[in-house]
Regions:
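Walker A/P-loop nucleotide-binding motif
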Residues: 97-122
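The feature captures the helix immediately C-terminal to the Walker
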Residues: 122-126, 312
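Post-Walker A helix-loop "phosphate-sensing" segment adjacent to the P-loop in P-loop NTPases
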Residues: 127-139, 170-173
């Protein structure tokens, strides 16, 4: 009965057109804004960064996170969970303890920087949780459905554990972080404490920027701590990072097993890219409207290397330059000015001279989400 009560506390799972519609974000836009003064148009121009068109990646991430949360909730307040609470208390007291409840789920979401991983995850979590904390009456408890933390830059195990406690306090108004700092808890004590907190109050834990473990001597220790947390709490853990983190997890079997998941590259020149470019180009704040041509679309792809955040930056900065310079036109001239003046540090990564459009534009690919990270 308890498991059913927890599951019904989250919104029903969506799919198909209903899911795409729920994920989509189209900022309000009125063409008459092009006749307003420059200051007003420049301020409204930032709405481009709010645009979000769900892609195949968005759908897959939503489904993966929803099912992982569901699996985690189904293990809470069972007889095994109660036994695990006693073991975690022993860990806090620095006594011998063991993991009884077992791991729920551990997976990765890996993709190049700028393809929209974090935004896709944020949109999915917002839809899955409704931005609400789960409350259960008997026995009374509160659960954060999805908790997102960042991997410390130095891969500090203690830093990550304290950050989890701090984020839980933000949602629940508790004092776990304050108490841990007051007693100067050791890492071993913190693992027991965080396991207990996760068992009682966390559904799904998302650890972003996991690539920080790659070049740190504490990297394997941090992944080991996450594994121990999974086994002692039964919650699902999602690790998000760039492709370099995949090389780290491939080093050993125990790491590879914990990093099974989904991977994405830059966007293909396909129907989705064309649709996204068309929608993005409809948000024009310059006085003279420009029609999106196949030539401009190809230019955008070649000068972004299929990285969606770069596409948005190009169109945004080109309009900003056009307004400030008085050119008032979004065309190849202003787009090229934006590329040369604003994106110079990315030239070595984009290389438009050798980035060519694939012959076929009809093959379906796992395209990334559409907004910058």
């Amino acid at each position: 009965m308890i498991k059913q009560n927890l599951v019904v506390k989250i919104p029903p799972m969506l799919a198909g057109t209903e899911l795409l519609s729920a994920l989509e974000v189209l900022p309000d836009y009125d063409e008459s804004i092009r006749d307003l003064d420059a200051a007003t148009r420049l301020m409204a121009l930032s709405d481009l960064y709010k645009l979000y068109l769900p892609s195949q990646m968005s759908v897959e991430i939503y489904s993966k996170l929803y099912l992982a949360l569901l699996h985690s909730l189904q293990k809470k307040q069972t007889s095994l969970a109660i036994q695990q609470q006693k073991q975690n208390y022993r860990a806090i007291r620095q006594q011998t303890y063991s993991g009884i409840i077992g791991g729920s789920d551990s997976f990765t979401i890996i993709g190049a920087s700028g393809i929209g991983k974090s935004t896709a995850i944020s949109r999915a979590i917002s839809l899955i949780t409704g931005n609400k904390v789960i409350e259960v009456e008997e026995p009374y408890t509160t659960i954060v459905p999805c908790l997102v933390v960042q991997c410390p830059f130095d891969s500090s195990v203690k830093g990550l554990l304290l950050e989890i406690l701090r984020k839980v306090d933000e949602y629940l108004g508790s004092k776990y972080y304050e108490n841990a700092m007051r007693v100067r808890a050791t890492t071993d004590m913190l693992i027991g404490s965080v396991s207990q907190v996760a068992l009682n109050h966390i559904g799904l834990l998302v650890v972003d920027e996991i690539q920080n473990v790659v070049n740190s001597k504490h990297g394997k220790s941090l992944v080991g701590a996450l594994t121990q947390l999974i086994n002692n709490s039964g919650i699902s853990v999602c690790m998000v990072g760039t492709p370099e983190s995949a090389l780290f997890f491939e080093q050993a079997m125990q790491l590879a097993r914990r990093s099974l998941g989904i991977q994405y590259g830059s966007m293909r020149y396909d129907a989705y890219f064309e649709e996204f470019s068309d929608v993005l180009f409809s948000y024009q704040f310059v006085r003279n409207e420009t029609i999106l041509t196949p030539g401009i679309m190809e230019w955008l792809y070649e000068h972004s290397a299929g990285i969606i955040s770069v596409v948005v930056s190009l169109v945004h900065d080109a309009q900003e330059i056009a307004i400030l310079s008085g050119k008032e036109c979004l065309n190849l001239e202003t787009l090229n000015m934006a590329y040369q003046q604003r994106l110079s540090l990315l030239h070595g990564y984009i290389e438009p001279a050798i980035t060519k459009k694939p012959q076929s534009t009809t093959t379906k690919q796992n395209a990334p989400a559409t907004k910058v990270i």
